[in-house]
Amino acid sequence: MSPLRARMIEDMTLAGLAEGTRKIYIQAVRRLAAHYRRSPDELSEEEVRRYLLGLRQRGVARGTFKTGQYGLRFLYRHTLGRDWLLFGEKKDRLATAQAAA
């Protein structure tokens, strides 16, 4: 097991993600790495964007696409600490709740 995969599994465990979710997220990362034949930590935001666009264009089921996207978002945001625009902005839940009150 690669150090990156081990770290992601640890991060998902700390985040309290279910075993099934962890497996799906790891599978999404594995598919991305296989597509480019490189470690995901070596990929640019544009490369990940093109990969996701290709999934959409091939007609991957919406649920499959979204869970894969969430898995990649977890990897890049939580494990690698990259806050890419590709995955949208993080919302400050407290500020949102206070603004709604």
Identify the residue ranges that each predicted region occupies.
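N-terminal core-binding DNA-recognition domain of tyrosine recombinases/integrases
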Residues: A6-Q98
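Intrinsically disordered, low-complexity and often Lys/Arg-enriched segments
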Residues: M1-S2
